[in-house]
From Swiss-Prot:
Its main location: cytoplasm. GO terms for cellular component: cytoplasm. GO terms for biological process: L-histidine biosynthetic process. CDD domains: NTP-PPase_HisE. Belongs to the PRA-PH family. Keywords: Amino-acid biosynthesis, ATP-binding, Cytoplasm, Histidine biosynthesis, Hydrolase, Nucleotide-binding. Pathway: Amino-acid biosynthesis; L-histidine biosynthesis; L-histidine from 5-phospho-alpha-D-ribose 1-diphosphate: step 2/9. It comes from the Bacteria. It comes from Mycolicibacterium smegmatis (strain ATCC 700084 / mc(2)155) (Mycobacterium smegmatis). This is Phosphoribosyl-ATP pyrophosphatase. GO terms for molecular function: ATP binding; phosphoribosyl-ATP diphosphatase activity.
Length: 93
């Protein structure tokens, strides 16, 4: 029997993060990050961007994909924090 991996899309992640920002579940790391503000989120983005670069230079594709996923997460947290929507970004692509 084939097993299927559940895949979270960029849009689904954004919806999940937006929901957490709205409902503020106790113990949520996303809520804690939002409460840390733009400065704290920005520091995480810089950290993750560096880790993406290092993974691209020195690690395999699996590690690189994981680091990119973390950078995308933090970028979306910043978007939610600033009130940007996916459409705001899509218009710039």
């Amino acid at each position: 029997m084939k097993q299927f991996m559940l895949v979270k899309t960029f849009d689904a992640l954004f919806a999940e993060l937006s929901d957490k920002a709205r409902t503020r579940p106790a113990g949520s790391g996303t809520v804690a990050a939002l409460d840390a503000g733009v400065h704290g989120i920005g520091k995480k983005i810089l950290e993750e961007a560096g880790e993406v670069w290092l993974a691209a230079e020195h690690e395999g594709d699996e590690a690189l994909a994981e680091e990119i996923s973390q950078l995308l997460y933090w970028t979306q947290v910043l978007m939610v924090s600033r009130g940007l929507t996916l459409d705001d970004v899509y218009r710039k692509l």
